[in-house]
Amino acid sequence: MSIRIIPQDELGSSEKRTADMIPPLLFPRLKNLYNRRAERLRELAENNPLGDYLRFAALIAHAQEVVLYDHPLEMDLTARIKEASAQGKPPLDIHVLPRDKHWQKLLMALIAELKPEMSGPALAVIENLEKASTQELEDMASALFASDFSSVSSDKAPFIWAALSLYWAQMANLIPGKARAEYGEQRQYCPVCGSMPVSSMVQIGTTQGLRYLRCNLCETEWHVVRVKCSNCEQSGKLHYWSLDDEQAAIKAESCDDCGTYLKILYQEKEPKVEAVADDLASLVLDARMEQEGYARSSINPFLFPGEGE
């Protein structure tokens, strides 16, 4: 199954009635999203060997919250949704959609917000980005979207991505339409922008027991059934790994068919789990999965591969 976004005026009456039974997509709910993430990162930093880096990530997340409301985005995406729907493509496809200068405006605002909080190497990095030309910044964004991580140093990538993510999340929040599940391929990528997931979550509340993958760029969540590999959609050779016990709130789902894994967070075990924060704070589990020979099928927006990795 794949997911396609349908313009509201093209939905039939039966689709309008059934679209919300199991929502294929959950568009980003931006209110306090970044504050919640920052709060969770700070909480997880306590007694964590990665505490300093988690607190660093919390500073970026908090800055995203501030910049989000200081620099709103106004954009009519109706025509874009119709065109993408007709082509069966993600409406905000990172490989096709032209980038507006708004994202660089967001980056400069993030840098201004973060400067007083940074020192040493981190301050040098954002000052270097501040001096970069428009074309240099565009080249780095294009490299990240092409997974050419050797062209963007791992210390610059989180700042570039934070601005791009804000821009794409703002656009995703403006999408006028519904989503429909259809037969198709590439369910491992976000149906809204085509980026990768950061992790998946088995939710509580109105989507109790359903698993959704969280986009590492536009913050959209999309439904993928449980006990199926989110990367290759096979189900016969899945294994579940945790550092604690079978009741752990964070597990890695590995697949021997494609050799990859993705983390699953369980809200029923820990209601405060957050897709980005808890993934970043559990890198010990990633190390275990690497030892077992599995490759990660996701990327955390605060931790990009460096050159040679």
Curated annotation (Swiss-Prot):
Native source organism of the sequence: Escherichia coli O127:H6 (strain E2348/69 / EPEC)
Keywords associated with the record: Cytoplasm
HAMAP family according to UniProt: FdeH
Gene3D superfamilies documented for this protein: FdhE-like domain
Major location category of this protein: cytoplasm
Name this protein carries in UniProt: Protein FdhE
GO biological processes: protein maturation
Domain of life of the organism encoding this protein: Bacteria
Disulfide-bond pairs as recorded: none
Function: Necessary for formate dehydrogenase activity.
GO CC annotation terms, alphabetical: cytosol
GO molecular function annotations of the record: ferric iron binding
CDD domains attached to this UniProt entry: FdhE (cd16341)
UniProt-annotated location(s): Cytoplasm
Key word Nucleus present: no
Recorded family membership: Belongs to the FdhE family.
